[in-house]
Amino acid sequence: MTPRLLFFLLWVASTAAAQTPAPTPTPEQSFDLFARFMLEGDADAEARIAALTGMPMRTERWEDAVDRMVVGEASADNARTRAGRDLSRQVALALRQTHCRSTGSERHDGEDVQVAIVAYTCQVPDYAAMDKGTPDDTASAPGDEGELAGVQHVIALLQRAPWRVHADSVVMARLNEDDVWTTQDMPPLQQWIELLLALPE
């Protein structure tokens, strides 16, 4: 076989492969994509979802979205805002470490819609397993000083807490075999942040 013919055959094969559409992700793969996109700010997952669904890419950076949900729309550059942004960065790190992934699914198709219940597990802070250590005296500090100390206390807990497994399930649905599986009841990002910050009483 001449080098020119070999090159031509390789070119034909690569062109055919490029034109072959990628298979539609399974319910489990679809959940993993959405989890990586929403909870980890994964740009590759976002691009894949946009290509599959036609959903426009978000204009807000994922880190900025987390910051807005933790700190709010505060614009003043003061100690309270800086502490809030420190907490926001720690929350973003904890979100990326949740590593929510599917563990299996069950089909429950109806007449007009295909449904899959996808089970998944995540890693979340296990505050209850932590040594109580010294009593928390942040509540006794006056005014802003107590509030700032409270934020630093939460940051320290997020940094030191061991992880526990959080298991749950979501509903994925599509109309037919050619459609993409989409989540129907995935908790929003704000709810995941609240879960990470659900400190023991």
Go through each PLM region and give its residues.
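Sec-dependent signal peptide recognition
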Residues: T2-F8
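Hydrophobic h-region of N-terminal signal peptides that target proteins for export
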Residues: L9-A18
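Second-shell loop/turn segments in exported
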Residues: T20-A22, S105, Q159
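Core segments of small alpha/beta cavity-forming domains
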Residues: T20-A94
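Surface-exposed, charged secondary-structure patches
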Residues: V70-G143
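Short Pro/Gly-enriched beta-strand edge/turn motifs at strand-loop
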Residues: R85-S88, G150-A156
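N-terminal post-signal-peptidase region of extra-cytosolic proteins
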Residues: H99-T103, H153-L158
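Short beta-strand edge/turn micro-motifs at domain boundaries
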Residues: A129, T138-A149, Q159-E201
